[in-house]
Amino acid sequence: ADSGEVDQLGQILAGIADGSLAPMRPDEEPKGSSKPAQKKPAQKKPETQLAQTKPSKTKPARSPRVRTLVIMIDPGHGGEDPGAIGRRHRTREKDVVLAVARILRQELNEIEGVKALLTRDGDYFVPLQRRVQKARAAKADFFVSIHADAWVKPTARGSSLYVLNTRGQVSTANRWLARKQNDADLIGGVNLSNKDKQIARILMDMSMTSQVSDSMVYGARILNELSRINQLHRGKVEQANFAVLKAPDIPSVLVETAFLSHPEEEKKLRTRAFQRKLAYAIGNGILKGFGHKSRLG
């Protein structure tokens, strides 16, 4: 890890301690609202009042502020990194996933109370750690990385979804802590001396455990939606040690949309219709996870 990654640990731990970095939990309603998200309505001219009513002496209650649900969408690869290459049509993964991500962003941003962002919006490379940093800087409630799979055998097919495998994650946290000077390691403004390192490790472990648990819930919703439009490669949420899934304070999933190495799936991935179906499936899984009643498509 470079010094930039290490310097983030104090901020992460401080947020864990005071709760300021905690994202929405699965099925949590946006704060201040019990109504489901709806499409943003067009502004209408106020209708003429036909009857005069006696004004109330009591002041009307202020409308509670609705918390915006922030979704960071990560189109994999980009620039000099094309990702997987299709066998028959030489379709590049970086192009397909960017198209899906752009559709997903556009559709989610039509939902009131939802804000969707991209880690890249063009054909350029973004380092993996920078993608995570962008999500944290935006205070994202959810992170979804979109990819297209490939395998040596052309028979492999289907959609997959991954969350972080926490095995070995404690050692990663230990390396971060070891690189950080004691006088700058802060949890809620408290200096982390050597005797406090164990506390920091415990907090990091608790945060990662919670992140993976929430990610599994969201992932299951998304995978169920994907099963409606495409065959699943495996019928369950899988776990792997992907670098882009390592934000300890943001539930994160990685979606493998289909196999570019499979001739039929490569052909489908090239079509706008299937790209839109994928975007809708991912978006609807996310919305369900956060308790929204609106659906894309």
Residue positions per predicted region:
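Short, basic/glycine-rich phosphate-binding loops at helix/coil junctions
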Residues: 198-202
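Generic hydrophobic, helix-prone segments enriched in Leu/Val/Ile
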Residues: 9-13, 176, 203-206
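Active-site-adjacent mobile loop/cap segments within catalytic or ligand-binding domains
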Residues: 91, 152, 203-297
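Short intrinsically disordered coil segments
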Residues: 11, 176-180, 270-274
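Surface-exposed edge beta-strands and adjoining flexible/disordered loops or tails in beta-rich
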Residues: 1-27
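Catalytic-core regions of hydrolytic enzymes
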Residues: 20-197, 208-220, 280, 296
